[in-house]
Amino acid sequence: MEVCIVKPDRIFFKEEADELLLPTNTGYIGILKDHAPLVTGLDNGVLGVRQGTTWRFLALLGGFGVIKEGRVNILCRDIQDASEINLEEAEQLAATAKESMTKSDSKKGYIENQLKFDRETARVAAAKMYKESAGGSPVFGN
């Protein structure tokens, strides 16, 4: 199936894939060739792309997915390939954002730090899956 992932500033990914695992607002969903038409909201999390026997992990920051006629279009706020994420840095940024949330004295500050925390949590999860995958099948939602 053809997969096209679009960020606000560019097309991030446009390739064929055999399987997708999408982080939806109600949990992970698997997409294979000839999937029934579907429009779904996407949550922050790890998007898995299988091409042959190789999995690629992407840190997805919300958006929408449209599945129709052998094509998957994903429009997202942001996305990053797990192979480009520094795990230790992402873990530190997540910890800092979480601490800042608890110390925030305004609703706006709390929400800004919550968004940072959610972003870094998705990046940490993607980086861990990339690091631990070493040829095996992914385990999503942990």
UniProtKB/Swiss-Prot annotation:
Family statement: Belongs to the ATPase epsilon chain family.
Subunit structure: F-type ATPases have 2 components, CF(1) - the catalytic core - and CF(0) - the membrane proton channel. CF(1) has five subunits: alpha(3), beta(3), gamma(1), delta(1), epsilon(1). CF(0) has three main subunits: a, b and c.
Alphabetical keyword list: ATP synthesis, CF(1), Chloroplast, Hydrogen ion transport, Ion transport, Membrane, Plastid, Thylakoid, Transport
GO MF annotations, alphabetized: ATP binding; proton-transporting ATP synthase activity, rotational mechanism
A Pfam family matched in the record: ATP-synt_DE_N
The protein's name in its UniProt record: ATP synthase epsilon chain, chloroplastic
Lineage of the species this protein comes from: Eukaryota, Viridiplantae, Chlorophyta, Mamiellophyceae, Mamiellales
GO annotations of cellular component type: chloroplast thylakoid membrane; proton-transporting ATP synthase complex
Claim: Transport is one of the keywords in the record: yes
